[in-house]
């Protein structure tokens, strides 16, 4: 297993920039900026909470401090062992968000949550986040529902997300964890920049 201690903080920051885990991309239908987060791209084995906080402080928060914005979080394909930073790290990152940025956040669109994510947030959501933020969370099971709120052609959506969305249309029970993901979803993981970097680190 790779550990974050094997790469410096500057390398961690460069990795976050390269993978575009967190990026301001497009606007919603009210003209507000959209902060897009791709959960599957977050290399939790390589990047510490401190490095993530520094990246957000330098690259993201200054762009969100003055006007309202929304978040689109793509949970598609997230693996707990590879992409989940841990409860304490999530809380630490949330606590580091400046008050004016929290106030400007209007909605969090949680795309492809799945049963486990819903249960996790139902159990720990109010512990991790303030009631105000938790109340802004909106589950989005299909991309078509996202486009009711977000300008479709302004927010870049990775191909593996659209592929998974098509699978859900054909096999809706996947939403509830009753069916496993389509094999092509697993194949796509090997093509992601996270996997490439991780395999390089392991070797």
Question: Where is each model-derived feature located?
Answer:
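Basic, amphipathic alpha-helical/coil surface patches used to engage anionic, phosphate-bearing ligands
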Residues: 1-203
């Amino acid at each position: 297993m790779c550990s974050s201690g094997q790469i410096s903080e500057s390398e961690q920051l460069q990795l976050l920039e390269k993978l575009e885990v967190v990026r301001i991309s497009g606007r919603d239908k009210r003209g507000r900026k959209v902060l897009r987060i791709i959960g599957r791209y977050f290399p939790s084995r390589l990047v510490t909470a401190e490095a993530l906080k520094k990246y957000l402080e330098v690259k993201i928060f200054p762009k969100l401090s003055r006007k309202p914005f929304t978040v689109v979080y793509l949970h598609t394909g997230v693996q707990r062992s590879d992409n989940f930073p841990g409860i304490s790290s999530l809380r630490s990152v949330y606590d580091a968000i400046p008050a004016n940025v929290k106030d400007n956040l209007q909605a969090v669109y949680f795309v492809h949550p799945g049963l486990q994510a819903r249960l996790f947030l139902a159990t720990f959501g109010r512990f991790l986040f303030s009631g105000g933020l938790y109340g802004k969370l909106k589950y989005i099971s299909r991309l078509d529902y996202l486009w009711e709120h977000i300008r479709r052609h302004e927010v870049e959506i990775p191909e593996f997300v659209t592929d998974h969305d098509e699978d859900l249309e054909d096999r809706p029970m996947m939403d509830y964890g009753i069916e496993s993901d389509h094999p092509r979803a697993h194949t796509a993981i090997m093509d992601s920049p996270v996997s490439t970097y991780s395999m390089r680190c392991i070797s």
